[in-house]
Design a protein with these regions (language model features):
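Conserved beta-strand elements of the Class I
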Residues: 117-119, 218-219
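Ferredoxin-reductase
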Residues: 2-92, 156-158, 183-187
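Histidine-anchored nucleotide/phosphate-binding helix
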Residues: 127-142
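Short, charged beta-turn/beta-strand-edge "cap" motif at the junction between a beta-strand
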Residues: 46-50, 98-103
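Phosphate-handling active-site elements
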Residues: 138-149, 241
Length: 253
C-alpha cells in the first residue's frame, strides 16, 4: 500500500500572540488530516520573484483542535521565522504541508495501554511538541491519565522565556498525575519546587526521585547539545535506549 502523498495547502492565520520575548504563537485554519500529538508540519513562503523558503515547525495544539497552533522562535537571519514573528498579520495565508512524523508521537488507546509513565524533557522551543502531548493527555479520560502519569522537565533561560508557563502550571494544579518542574539557566526560579540551574544528570536524578515513577516512554526535544546531554543522562539512569524518543531542532530559518 502506497503512503499518502502530502500536498501543500493554504492556511489562514487567524490569531497571533507574542507569548515570550523571542517566541510568537500563530493559530492557523487549514484543511489537513488530523494530527497526532508530537507531529510537525512544513511551512513554505514564496516571494513575488518566486524564491521559496521552507521550515518545519512542531504542532503545539492538541489533536482535534479547530486550529493548528505553531510556536515560532525568532532566529537571527531566519527567513521563515523572521516573517512569521515580525511581518505576518491576521488574515495572511501561508503554505502548509503535514502532519509529518511517526517516531515522536504519543497516542495511547483509551485504556492507556502501551503508555505507562511518561517523561517529557524539553529545552527552549523544544517544549512545543511536548505541549501537544500534554494537551492531548489532559483531554483524555481520567483512566488514561491515571494509566500514564507524566513528568515534564522544561528548561529555558529565564522565567519570562518559559513558553506556555501559566497553562502548564494550571495543568499541574488540576491534575495530581501531572508533575511539572522548570529549570532556568540565567534567571531566578519563581517556585520552590523548580531549579535555577542547567539541567544536568544530577538534577535529572533528583527530579526522577521526587516523581517516584519509572518512565516507560521518554520524549526529549531541544537543541542537538541539549538532547545529547539528556539522552546520555537517561541511559546512565538505567532507562533503556529503546524507550527514549528524541527530536532535535536546528538553528536556521
Amino acid at each position: 500500500m502506497m503512503a499518502e502523498v502530502l500536498r501543500w495547502q493554504s492556511g489562514m492565520i487567524e490569531r497571533i500572540a507574542h507569548t515570550t520575548p523571542r517566541v510568537t504563537n500563530l493559530w492557523l485554519r487549514v484543511a489537513l488530516s488530523p494530527h497526532i500529538a508530537g507531529q510537525h508540519m512544513d511551512v513554505r513562503l514564496t516571494a513575488p520573484d518566486g524564491y521559496q523558503a521552507q521550515r518545519s515547525y512542531s504542532i503545539a495544539s492538541a489533536p482535534g483542535a479547530p486550529l493548528i497552533e505553531l510556536a515560532v522562535e525568532a532566529l537571527e537571519d531566519g527567513e521563515v521565522s523572521s516573517y512569521l514573528c515580525e511581518i505576518a498579520q491576521v488574515g495572511d495565508t501561508v503554505e502548509l504541508r503535514g502532519p509529518i512524523g511517526g517516531h515522536f508521537i504519543w497516542s495511547p488507546d483509551e485504556s492507556g495501554h502501551a503508555s505507562g509513565a511518561v517523561l517529557l524533557v524539553g529545552g527552549g522551543s523544544g517544549v512545543v511538541p511536548l505541549m501537544s502531548i500534554v494537551r492531548s493527555r489532559a483531554a483524555r479520560s481520567g483512566a488514561v491519565r491515571a494509566a500514564s502519569p507524566m513528568l515534564l522537565l522544561y528548561s529555558a533561560r529565564s522565567w519570562e522565556e518559559l513558553i506556555y508557563r501559566d497553562e502548564l502550571i494550571a495543568f499541574e494544579a488540576n491534575d495530581p498525575t501531572f508533575m511539572l518542574r522548570f529549570t532556568t539557566t540565567r534567571g531566578a526560579k519563581h517556585r520552590d519546587v523548580d531549579f535555577d540551574q542547567r539541567l544536568t544528570e544530577m538534577l535529572l536524578r533528583t527530579a526522577l526521585a521526587h516523581w517516584g515513577q519509572t518512565a516507560q516512554l521518554v520524549y526529549t526535544c531541544g537543541s542537538n547539545a541539549f538532547v545529547e546531554t539528556i539522552t546520555s543522562a537517561l541511559v546512565h539512569q538505567s532507562i533503556p535506549a529503546e524507550r527514549i524518543r528524541a527530536e532535535r531542532y536546528g538553528g536556521t530559518s
